[in-house]
Regions:
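Bacterial N-terminal signal peptides that target proteins for export
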Residues: 2-10
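Flexible helix-coil transition and linker loops at the boundaries of alpha-helical arrays
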Residues: 60-63, 95-99
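N-terminal export/targeting signal detector
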Residues: 10, 21-24
Length: 492
């Protein structure tokens, strides 16, 4: 949003206000993280399709396995079926030395051991070799289809499960395959949420009401500086964040990420001569691009377009390109990094309060899930905004940390909080403002809801956002803002 510097010795000055741009970036990231978390929570249900680790026992007794085909063949199957992974390497090594052994069984065993250890490339290589050696073995076909499923190769998995069924499987295994098909249907659908809410904002124009007299004479102020007063307003807001993946072949996918959110404020600017009359906003983003996805990695290249509406007019149209890589280190740890470049082009009306510029951004993220209902996440972002005017160009870095926790119980209570600290410095001294601008901003976002209190499938959610911006030019850019909203959200 714009700020206006007013003084009798200066007719007008249009200021490019970075905090409003930062606010949109923060809201976009918060919604994207929320959508990603929803997908990860659904993926946790898929883990129930795999048996947990066990111990090396059979019917309560421990057996010594001699080096014979008659003993090692069933021992390998028992070790696999009961997750006796510590003993499996010894069994397979001795089994391979025996004449007349089945190479496919040894490769299947080594594949499942590699899967247990998290080495999916080796697991797939060994299982595909086993399938080539015994193309009609139902167990090999089933395990290969499961590996393809876990590696996000849905088309291959679907074909693999069909071949396994044709090879003949017990009824309980057929029911398990049906569960895999249901899981693939869920994967192929839309994920995300839509929300509608009402609330209150105590400073929609990010103002501070600063006043000072620059020159007195004989008790009369001849030169004064007066900034706008904060405008309070009730509001209506909405959010829509969706994601869908189309498996093309193997690990290659087409990914869609549409997103839109906005706020309507009941109050407008009381000054009819002000450049900014209506602070209501709407942001829409569409990302369409390529994604490589396997059991451990997600690599995406996403061109996108962004449209911003405010002051009752189209404000700007931006287009950009995002490259993102995320790596799952273990069941608990995930890291990621991203590069983003974007070009903002303002409309004729938008140029009253802004100017065209380029933004380049690098980000680093990490998340830790100590338990299935708790997630800690953090990130660091470096940004560069380049205008034609050096005084308006800036560099900034931002650090954020967040916590999500779902409480046990019928109410389904959950809380999601994020804190952001941002430090921004402009490139050059501005003689109109009298200094080289530097801002330090804090943003706190807290949302809490109850999945057990749904009304017509809608979850009630309370959200509070508080922003504090300190500047060496505090009279122009310093402000505090608090927004509270009650939303009803539908998860997809």
């Amino acid at each position: 949003m714009p700020c206006r510097f007013r003084a009798v010795w200066l007719l007008s000055l249009a200021c490019l206000v970075a905090p409003a741009i930062w606010a949109d970036d923060d809201d976009t990231r918060f919604l994207q993280d929320q959508t990603r978390r929803s997908i990860e929570q659904k993926a946790q249900a898929e883990e129930a399709l795999a048996a947990p680790p066990g111990t090396l026992m059979y019917e309560g007794r421990r057996y010594q396995v001699p080096s014979t085909l008659e003993a090692l063949t069933p021992a390998i199957y028992v070790a696999i079926n009961t997750n006796q992974w510590r003993q499996l390497p010894d069994f397979v090594a001795r089994y391979r030395e025996l004449p007349g052994h089945r190479p496919a069984l040894a490769n299947m065993a080594e594949s499942l051991l590699a899967r247990f250890e998290g080495n999916y490339p080796l697991a797939l290589q060994r299982m595909e070799l086993a399938s080539e050696q015994e193309p009609t073995d139902a167990r090999v076909l089933l395990e290969l289809a499961r590996l393809w499923f876990e590696d996000h190769q849905e088309k291959r998995a679907e074909q693999g499960f069909a071949r396994a069924l044709d090879a003949g499987l017990p009824l309980e295994v057929q029911m398990l395959i049906q569960q895999y098909h249901q899981a693939m249907d869920i994967r192929a659908g839309w994920h995300g949420s839509a929300a509608l809410g009402v609330g209150y904002n105590d400073n929609i124009n990010q103002a501070n009401g600063y006043y000072s007299c620059l020159n007195y004479f004989a008790g009369i102020c001849f030169f004064e500086r007066q900034m706008p007063d904060p405008i309070e307003s009730e509001l209506v807001s909405y959010e829509l964040s969706l994601q869908r993946r189309y498996n093309l072949s193997g690990n290659h996918n087409l990914q869609l990420r549409p997103m839109s959110y906005g706020t309507y404020y009941a109050e407008t600017n009381p000054s009819r001569t002000a450049t900014m009359q209506d602070y209501s906003t709407n942001l829409a983003i569409l990302q369409v691009g390529y994604q490589y996805l396997d059991a451990r990695n997600s690599i995406s290249l996403m061109p996108y377009a962004e449209h911003y509406y405010r002051n009752r007019a189209s404000d700007y149209l931006a287009h950009g390109l995002q490259l993102e890589w995320r790596r799952t280190l273990s069941r608990k740890w995930q890291i990621g990094t991203s590069l983003d470049t974007k070009r903002y082009e303002y409309t004729s009306k938008g140029q009253r309060t802004g100017a065209d510029y380029e933004m380049h951004q690098w980000g680093l993220t990490a998340s830790f899930m100590p338990q299935p209902n708790t997630s800690l996440y953090t990130g660091l972002t470096l940004s560069r905004r380049k205008y034609e005017i050096e005084q308006a160009s800036s560099k900034d870095w931002a650090a954020r940390v967040g916590l999500y926790h779902a409480f046990p119980g019928r109410a389904g209570l959950f809380v999601n909080g994020m804190g952001i600290y941002r430090d921004s410095r402009n490139d050059a001294h501005d003689f109109f403002l009298g200094d080289r601008r530097r801002d330090r901003q804090q943003v706190y976002i807290l949302s809490a809801g109850a999945n057990g209190w749904k009304v017509a499938g809608l979850t009630p959610e309370l959200r509070v956002r508080h922003s504090i911006n300190h500047s060496n030019l505090d009279w122009a850019f310093g402000f505090e803002q608090t927004e509270v909203s009650l939303m009803l959200r539908r998860q997809f």
